[in-house]
Structures are given as structure tokens and as C-alpha cells.
Amino acid sequence: MRCFKATIAYDGAYFLGYAKQPNKLGVQDKIEDALNALGIKSVVIAAGRTDKGVHANNQVLSFHAPKHWNAAKLFYYLAPKLAPHIVLKKLEEKNFHARFDAQKRAYRYLLTKNLKTPFLAPYIACGDYGSLDALNTALKQFTGKHDFSMFKKEGGATTNPKRTIFNAFAYKTFIIGHECVVFKIIGDAFLRSSVRLIIQACVQYSLEKITLAEIQAQIHNLKATIRTPIMANGLYLHRVYY
């Protein structure tokens, strides 16, 4: 068997998350079904398991295929079976583990105050976010190594809630005629819905609905003020570092 590394992008609006689902509406279901149609039976491992509605620009996968498959041939037959909602960007033969070999994951979140067309609604979140300075003040609280037990939803297989965030900041830009705030958070790994809970906390602070002290109390697992993640549609798994 040969091990392959695949880099894909997908539209999370069409899936119930990355992981396999009973109704087969997970990204993993679609990819494994496409491989099965080519006679390849393999579990597909992802660098990160995104939630329902979350997108990916550069998700990384690892899987195995029989030796008669090379990267060029497999790309040719696999890419059309994944389209249009999953795009196979790159495929190479590489002996590695997509999840355990990853060193860092980078997420981006797109948020605008005024969405001018419904056609962008699945891809840019809409809502007030206060001031950019306040957002960045809140984001700085999360850098470093922390126990994120109070910044995760129930579920997930991990038993270690400690994660390191290397960088977290926000900036403004224009995306398809919309002024947006883009949040960028880079960490070694993330717990379930952790990124969206972090961004929700920062937005609520910027809107003066919670204080920095309340954010710090939740980071230190003293009291949970933010329990509901921000909407999923603005979130993208942007890059995985190896």
C-alpha cells in the first residue's frame, strides 16, 4: 500500500462537518465513497475535523491506496468524483499522518456588519463586532498555552484540553465589496468549536457586553460566561503547517 497526502478545499455549507455522519453527509463520507468507487478502501485522516457549516481552504488528508496507483493517475480519477463541493488541490505520495504530524493549524473567520447579498450568506458571517482595537485586545488574552476546557463544546475524543495559541489577531479588509473583519488564529490544535467560542468572546467584549476579567476567568476555568459559539459560516480552516 502507498500513503498519499491530499490537500483539499471544501464548501462547508453542503456538509454536516468533516466527520462521517449516519446520513453520509460528512466530508469524510464523500471522500471515502469516492475512493471506494475506485476500488480503494481506506480510512481518510484529516488534519482537523471541522464542524457543520465550517469551510476549508487547505484541509490536509492522509490515506492509503494499492501500489498500482500513483499520484497523477489517482488525481485524474478522484478529482471529478469530489467536485463540485470538494476541490482536490494537490495529491502526492508521502508517508505521513495528517493529524499527528501537523504542527500548527491556522483558522480565519470573516465577519461583516452589513451583508449586501444573500448569496454570500453561507461564506461571510454578518453581525456587529464593535471596534478593531477592542477585538485585538481580547484576542491577545488567548495567546500562550492554556487549558481550554471552558472554550469547547461537548464531544470529541481528546482527553487533553491544553492547547497553545501562537498568534491571534484581527484586521479589516474588503471582500467582494464588503468591509470585513478577518480574525486569524494559529494554534497547535483546537478543541471542538474552540475557535468559534474564542471569537464570540472577543466580539462580546468589543460590544461591551462582557469584560476582560470575565474572559480571563473563563480561560482559567473559574467561570464560563460565553457558552454559545459564534455562527459557523464565517470560519475557514486556512492552512496546516508540517
Curated annotation (Swiss-Prot):
Molecular function (GO) terms listed?
pseudouridine synthase activity; RNA binding; tRNA pseudouridine(38-40) synthase activity
Q: What's the encoding gene here?
A: truA
The protein's UniProt keywords, in alphabetical order, are:
Isomerase, tRNA processing
The record's active-site residues are 51
Which domain of life, per UniProt? Bacteria
Q: Which InterPro entries match?
A: PsdUridine_synth_cat_dom_sf (IPR020103), PsdUridine_synth_TruA (IPR001406), PsdUridine_synth_TruA_a/b_dom (IPR020097), PsdUridine_synth_TruA_C (IPR020095), TruA/RsuA/RluB/E/F_N (IPR020094)
Q: Summarize the protein's role.
A: Formation of pseudouridine at positions 38, 39 and 40 in the anticodon stem and loop of transfer RNAs.
Say if the entry is tagged with keyword Cell membrane: no
Chain sites annotated for binding substrate: 107
In which family does this protein belong, per the annotation? Belongs to the tRNA pseudouridine synthase TruA family.
Please give the Gene3D superfamilies that the UniProt record associates with this protein.
Answer: Pseudouridine synthase I, catalytic domain, C-terminal subdomain, Pseudouridine synthase I, catalytic domain, N-terminal subdomain
Enzyme class, top EC level, equals isomerase
Q: What protein am I looking at?
A: tRNA pseudouridine synthase A
Catalysed conversion reaction = uridine(38/39/40) in tRNA = pseudouridine(38/39/40) in tRNA
- What EC number(s) does the entry state? 5.4.99.12
| Keyword Isomerase attributed | yes
Q: Can you supply a Gene Ontology BP term from the record?
A: tRNA pseudouridine synthesis
Subunit details for this protein? Answer: Homodimer.
Family matches, as HAMAP family: TruA (MF_00171)
